[in-house]
């Protein structure tokens, strides 16, 4: 039986498991400061054409989202998201629990547009009313929770409107690989680094046992990010497991080879909900 309930019902790709077995008894230092993670960071930077980016590894999507948002926002600031966005629907109020409001807005397809961002800013008096939450970040997913994808023009337009209002653009890439191989996609990996202040490449939903690679391109978001990881409970002691997996994941484009399967399952699940 094939289950479409989620895209992490099985373990890991055999090549990933083989890499883990090979390095299983290698003695390393902890907390992702080892040579395996250093190698993986270099591969991530090269693949996304962002040599100056900071790369951090997190166990899963929710801890990645909460850590990035908490690190980027001041106490009175909030994050704009589609009403179907993962941080608004499926994270048990994790963002609000950290003290930041999710400024959700209804969308027809799970995607945000410049017009929707402007509407949220209008509702919040363009950030000029001290009695209201000040939106400071835009959160999007690619692929979205509805299985839709962004085009390069759409991502560039969001980047532009974020610059207009002084907003950070944060892309949840839990299903990034699926988006990149989807029919109609015209984005390349380097486009995420070009247009986003911070994004992450997901592995949990695409053949890794666990792991997301957070990529920070905006210099303002880089300082003390590891402090925030630790404070939020995301500092993984056996960090070499991230490095080993992501190196296997990105070498020979394994991440894109596996992606058509996960994208097909995602679309099948979403279609079944409409029956």
Language-model features: locations:
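PLP-dependent aminotransferase-class I/II
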Residues: 99-145, 150-157
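Conserved small/polar residues in nucleotide/adenosyl-binding loops
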Residues: 264-271
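Conserved N-terminal alpha-helix of the aminotransferase class I/II PLP-enzyme fold
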Residues: 13-60, 83-88, 94
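Conserved PLP-anchoring active-site segment centered on the Schiff-base-forming lysine
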Residues: 71-89, 118
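Conserved core segment of the aminotransferase class I/II
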Residues: 212-236, 247-253
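Active-site PLP attachment segment
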Residues: 95, 175, 193-222
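Catalytic PLP-binding core of fold-type I/II PLP enzymes
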Residues: 150-182
